[in-house]
Amino acid sequence: GNPIEMLKSSIGKFNHNVSTLNKGEIYNTRFLNNQELLCCRSPHVTIGNILVAKNTYVGEIDTYFNLTDEIVCLNSINDNILERLSGCDFDSDQMLITNDKILLNAAKKNYSLFKVPTSNVHARKVQRKYTSEDQADLDIRTSNNLIGEIINLSQQLNSQLWDKANNYTKQTGCSIFDLYNT
C-alpha cells in the first residue's frame, strides 16, 4: 500500500491529497528506477486486471522500511489500482511483476480499451465482539463464501470470450472489440 501515508496517518499527519507515489507508479527494489513494468495478480479475473506501471524510487520509503525484492509499494490513493489488480489488498497478496518487453508490449496494445471491473457493492458493516461466538459465526459465514466458484466461472467465461474472439476474428476479419457491439 502507501507505506509513508500509513505512517503519517498513525501520527495524525496524513493528507488525502498528497502521496509519495503518484497514479501509475509502484516501488520495488528488484527493478531499476523509472523502469516500465507489467503487474498481474492472481486471481486474474478478466482482461482489465493488468497494470502497466513505472517503478519509482522513493528514498523516504527506504528510510523507514526494510524492503526486499519481494515487496512492492503502490499508491491506492485516488486510483483504481486495487480493482485493476483484481481486488488487491494489503495482506500478503501475490503478483507477477515483469519487465519482459514481449509481455509489456502485449499488455499495452489494448491497455486503455479494456475496462477495469468494479463492483461498487458496499459491504454492510457488522459490529462484532471478540468472543468465541462471534469468531465461530464469522468462520461459518466465510466458509460459505462463493469466491472460489465465482473465480472459476470467470475463468471459464474468459476462455470462451477469447476462443470466440479469435474464431470470430478469423471468420469475419473483425476485432475482439466488435464482439461487444453485437
Question: Which residues does each PLM region occupy?
Answer:
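Conserved catalytic alpha/beta cores of large enzymes that bind or transform nucleotide phosphates
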Residues: 85-95, 101-106, 111-182
